[in-house]
């Protein structure tokens, strides 16, 4: 059950005030004392992986922080996380998705017996998602014999008409399902090694899994085996590697009937 209407509204208001204060203070510092806030932003970029991404310089992304577009996106992510009800060990939400062919499906359709299913939520405009995509592909290569993988393309993290970075992939907000499918097809050029589906335009999967801007999950037999933290700070394919490796060891040690 979700929060009662009034309780949720109060929590949303609290988040609104907190984010607004953060943006206001950050904007003042960035405008009046840019050299003072630079070390803080650079430290943050180390955690998100932006500092290691050769595609971007500090000037490509730092000036966009604390902008109006930044405010609305951060607020949306925080509001989404308020309603996050997924927990490790709980039943995994069986949300609707769409194949690149346009065929409708549900996440549980991709689960096979007791094989783990790795869910990779993200979008091409999310720098850390693309930067770490090769890590995800290595997961597919290393564990495809024992696990299944699915990339779920969600709404853009840094759309060109939203909170946009310079030198980023130029993709607008998806106005309809066809635009979302078109954006998701760009991932095929990177040879993902697994099926790619898109979230519905109601963003149902993203909401149920609190996946914005990117997130990793491992499901098994209908339950959440691993729940990664929200990206970009906590998007760690290496954690999924450790989970799958442990499963392989446990399976090898299990007595055979």
Swiss-Prot record:
Pfam families hit by this protein: T4_deiodinase
Keyword annotations of the record: Cell membrane, Endoplasmic reticulum, Membrane, Oxidoreductase, Selenocysteine, Thyroid hormones biosynthesis, Transmembrane, Transmembrane helix
Ranges in a coiled coil: none
Tissue spec: Liver specific.
Segments on the Extracellular side according to the record's topology features: 1-12
GO molecular function (one): thyroxine 5-deiodinase activity
Chain ranges on the Cytoplasmic side, renumbered to this chain: 34-257
Membrane topology recorded in Swiss-Prot or TrEMBL: Single-pass type III membrane protein
GO terms for biological process, alphabetical: hormone biosynthetic process; thyroid hormone catabolic process
InterPro entries reported in the protein's UniProt record: Iodothyronine_deiodinase (IPR000643), Iodothyronine_deiodinase_AS (IPR008261), Iodothyronine_deiodinase_I/III (IPR027252), Thioredoxin-like_sf (IPR036249)
Gene3D superfamilies on file: Glutaredoxin
EC number of this enzyme: 1.21.99.3, 1.21.99.4
Cellular component, GO annotation: basolateral plasma membrane; endoplasmic reticulum membrane
Active-site residues, as the UniProt record annotates them: 126
PANTHER family (UniProt xref): IODOTHYRONINE DEIODINASE (PTHR11781), TYPE I IODOTHYRONINE DEIODINASE (PTHR11781:SF22)
Family: Belongs to the iodothyronine deiodinase family.
Subunit structure, interactors included: Predominantly monomer. Can form homodimers but homodimerization is not essential for enzyme activity.
Protein's recorded name: Type I iodothyronine deiodinase
Biological source species: Suncus murinus
């Amino acid at each position: 059950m979700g929060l009662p209407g009034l309780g949720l509204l109060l929590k949303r208001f609290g988040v609104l005030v907190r984010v607004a204060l953060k943006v206001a203070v950050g904007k003042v510092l960035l405008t009046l004392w840019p050299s003072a806030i630079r070390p803080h932003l650079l430290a943050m970029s180390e955690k998100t992986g932006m500092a290691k991404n050769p595609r971007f310089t500090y000037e490509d992304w730092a000036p966009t922080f604390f902008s109006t577009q930044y405010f609305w996106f951060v607020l949306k992510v925080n509001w989404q996380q308020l309603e996050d009800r997924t927990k490790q060990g709980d039943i995994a939400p069986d949300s609707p998705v769409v194949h690149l062919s346009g065929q409708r499906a549900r996440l549980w359709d991709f689960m096979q017996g007791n094989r783990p299913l790795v869910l990779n939520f993200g979008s091409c405009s999310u720098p850390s998602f693309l930067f770490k995509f090769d890590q995800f592909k290595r997961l597919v290569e290393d564990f495809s014999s024992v696990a299944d993988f699915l990339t779920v393309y969600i709404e853009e993290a840094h759309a060109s008409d939203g909170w946009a970075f310079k030198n980023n992939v130029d993709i607008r907000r998806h106005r309809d399902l066809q635009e979302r499918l078109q954006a998701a097809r760009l991932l095929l050029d990177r040879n993902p090694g697994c099926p790619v589906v898109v979230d519905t335009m109601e963003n149902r999967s993203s909401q149920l899994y609190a996946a914005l801007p990117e997130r990793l999950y491992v499901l098994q037999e209908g339950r959440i085996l691993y729940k990664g933290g929200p990206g970009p700070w906590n998007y760690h394919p290496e954690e999924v590697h450790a989970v799958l490796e442990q499963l392989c060891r446990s399976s090898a040690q299990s007595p055979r009937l």
